[in-house]
């Protein structure tokens, strides 16, 4: 009973969010979903099923349907997976050693473990679209870091969250002088990254370099898809109605 005061409001809030999401999804009023998750997120048990259902209803039940849909959205997925708090993934920890760079591989646990656990048994993460009979993995993942916490935790220096903003500066790690270069190589060699990022090098430049927090590609792709999404959704809806009529 002592936990009711904190647990009950959280349950009601989550129930309200789930209700509203399902309501607007069923009425086709959600064009894009930006699913934000941080590095060690303990997702609700049903979140994977919720995302999968939305994908099936709004993008396609299988790789072939999704391929047709994305042909009308300039190749941009209406589902954006936003890897928030990416500054935590990038931070140098006490376990990172210059003489054993293999420890850096643990920085990508979000991609290797957390995200696949959220998605669950659904196959769309690895079989998003198809080209020439070959399945292509989902590649609309956007790492996003926080400028303030990047400075606060020693990833970069110089940024101020006050009224006067200042540009970032490189941070020197005394115990690991080449830390960021080694971390970059670890990121680029990670198998999940190689599979699920169209250009890992570009992704790194857009989120893990000075004054780049990862927001630009999100804004860019939202701008690209916004002008064509309504027509693509109308076309998909019409195709589904025709299929139902023939059934």
Regions found by a protein language model. Give the residues of each.
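Conserved GTPase G-domain substructure that encodes guanine base recognition and part of the catalytic core
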Residues: 6-33, 39-246
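Switch I (G2) and immediately adjacent beta-strands of P-loop GTPase domains
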Residues: 1-2
């Amino acid at each position: 009973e002592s936990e009711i005061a904190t647990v009950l409001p959280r349950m009601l809030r989550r129930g309200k969010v789930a209700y509203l999401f399902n309501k607007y999804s069923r009425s086709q009023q959600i064009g894009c979903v930006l699913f934000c998750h941080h590095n060690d997120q303990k997702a609700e048990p049903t979140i994977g099923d919720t995302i999968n259902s939305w994908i099936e209803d709004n993008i396609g039940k299988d790789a072939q349907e999704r391929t047709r849909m994305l042909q009308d959205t300039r190749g941009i997925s209406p589902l954006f997976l936003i890897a928030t708090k990416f500054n935590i993934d990038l931070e140098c920890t006490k376990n990172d050693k210059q003489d054993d760079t293999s420890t850096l591989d643990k920085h990508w646990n979000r991609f290797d473990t957390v995200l696949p656990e959220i998605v669950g048994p659904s196959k769309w993460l690895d079989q998003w679209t198809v080209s020439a009979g070959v399945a292509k993995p989902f590649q609309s993942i956007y790492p996003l870091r926080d400028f303030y916490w990047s400075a606060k935790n020693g990833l970069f220096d110089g940024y101020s969250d006050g009224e006067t903003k200042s540009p970032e500066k490189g941070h020197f790690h005394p115990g690991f002088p080449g830390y960021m270069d080694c971390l970059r190589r670890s990121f680029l060699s990670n198998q999940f990254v190689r599979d699920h990022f169209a250009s890992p090098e570009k992704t790194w430049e857009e989120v893990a370099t000075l004054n780049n927090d990862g927001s630009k590609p999100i804004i860019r792709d939202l701008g690209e898809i916004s002008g064509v999404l309504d027509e693509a959704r109308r076309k998909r809806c019409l195709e589904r109605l025709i299929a139902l009529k023939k059934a």
